């Protein structure tokens, strides 16, 4: 009931997370009520909560700053910058990129692309996240560099894949620390994803 909703909010869950929990519980109650012909009302139906509570607005990175960052990536030319460049022109989530195998990068197709699929060390956020992503611009450059790197590892980014786990938190901390010097305040690696959405709409 509402006490459980208030408990979740008190724990610090943002509105969208509260919504997912409540939806799951609502479905269980609906099933039980239907299956056992119970004469009671589902207490989780019609429950109000602020879905945007605790969610900070994520800003897109302006295109001029994207180009500046991409130029810096090609100048520094190391695996951290390859990951930044890869994300910048694909709209991938950082964890998706960090957990790639080199065999997920298909450069010899008519349209070079990443075949993004779940792996035991890095699942995807949703079933719809499995997709082919075209490689262009900075992301194609990064993919080409990755295909030639780390001959002793199947991973595109070995430093973030150890003990059968992709350490996307470590990647996020390192890359956001570097990125914040070159993008507006409030922008993060995830902002490339929002920028890609805006670029595709333009």
Identify the function of each model-found stretch.
Residues 1-6, 45-48, 197:
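Short, conserved phosphate-binding/catalytic loop or strand-edge motifs used
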Residues 1-30, 55, 76, 164-170, ...:
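N-terminal core-binding DNA-recognition domain of tyrosine site-specific recombinases/integrases
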Residues 9, 87-88, 201-202:
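Short amphipathic helical patch at the helix-1/turn junction of helix-turn-helix
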Residues 15-24, 34, 38-100, 128-129, ...:
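Basic, Lys/Arg- and aromatic-enriched nucleic-acid-binding interface segment
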Residues 33-42, 106-109, 146-150:
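Proline-centered turn/helix-capping motifs that create local helix->coil transitions or kinks
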Residues 46-49, 99-144:
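Conserved tyrosine-mediated DNA breakage-rejoining catalytic core shared by Y-recombinases
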Residues 96-98, 187-188, 197, 202:
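Active-site-proximal segment of tyrosine recombinases
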Residues 119-120, 136-185:
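Active-site/catalytic core of tyrosine-dependent DNA strand-transfer enzymes
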